[in-house]
Amino acid sequence: MTTHLQAKATLHNGVEMPWFGLGVFQVEEGSELVNAVKTAIVHGYRSIDTAAIYGNEAGVGEGIREGIEEAGISREDLFITSKVWNADLGYEETLAAFETSLSKLGLDYLDLYLIHWPVEGKYKEAWRALETLYKEGRIKAIGVSNFQIHHLEDLMTAAEIKPMINQVEFHPRLTQKELIRYCQNQGIQMEAWSPLMQGQLLDHPVLADIAQTYNKSVAQIILRWDLQHGIITIPKSTKEHRIKENASVFDFELTQDDMNRIDALNENLRVGPDPDNFDF
């Protein structure tokens, strides 16, 4: 059971990744971003998730450097994720995109690098690039994002190395049970983006009722639900009190009955694009 903020999941290659991290989607470059990353690290977060398309890797890198200094830790204590964008999928293109991300972040290796979306006809060559970088020790773990079962099956017909992570949209309205079961059977660790459904679930009466029982916020209930399902979670926030509150989910446990009540909210409802039908 996940008992503290720095508890880690062990990926199928033996690399350990924190169960809990900070997401920075839709946070623009600037002092707010730098402070959010630094604040999270100072408050004990050890995992930061960004992506090339977010356009904020430089600020994330600055926040990492400031956070390391203020928290008195080393780079090796952190787990940093970025993702290659669709326009850069391809063997040489992906290798080049990785160098660009690394340079913007100001790092000499990444802990996790993901293919952001399953662009048909492109992701196998991109995966080959990730395998190369992994074998060279430039990345500690490699994975995918927004891949459905059929994408994973197709990728693995050509892959030498199985993805360690599949990061997908996951929240009480989109529980992706079949995909989770498939990934668990394959030894692919699931990770949730947009775990709070971009704030749309924070007024939900069932969740509010459960939150009252535990004297916790709705956000804390949802994030705890992620962890009890064995899913890594990376909620986004730039506000210090929220960064602290989101991470305060290790001093209680949801009953099986409450887990079931939350599971029952599923409507297969997405806030993000459908991985089988996107055009970017």
Curated annotation (Swiss-Prot):
Q: Record's Pfam families? A: Aldo_ket_red
Residues that coordinate or bind substrate: 116
Q: Which domain of life is it from?
A: Bacteria
One annotated GO molecular function is: aldo-keto reductase (NADPH) activity
Q: Which CDD domains match?
A: AKR_AKR5G1-3
Which segments does the entry list as coiled coil?
A: none
What Enzyme Commission number(s) apply to this enzyme? 1.-.-.-
Q: Which UniProt keywords apply?
A: NADP, Oxidoreductase
Q: Where is this site: Lowers pKa of active site Tyr?
A: 83
Active-site residues per Swiss-Prot or TrEMBL entry: 54 (proton donor)
Binding-site list for NADP(+): 194-246
At the top of the EC hierarchy, this enzyme's class is oxidoreductase
Q: Which InterPro entries match?
A: AKR, AKR5G, Aldo/ket_reductase_CS, NADP_OxRdtase_dom, NADP_OxRdtase_dom_sf
Q: Which PROSITE patterns match?
A: ALDOKETO_REDUCTASE_1 (PS00798), ALDOKETO_REDUCTASE_2 (PS00062), ALDOKETO_REDUCTASE_3 (PS00063)
Record carries keyword ATP-binding: no
- Similarity comment: Belongs to the aldo/keto reductase family.
What name has this protein been given in UniProt?
Uncharacterized oxidoreductase YtbE
The encoding gene: ytbE
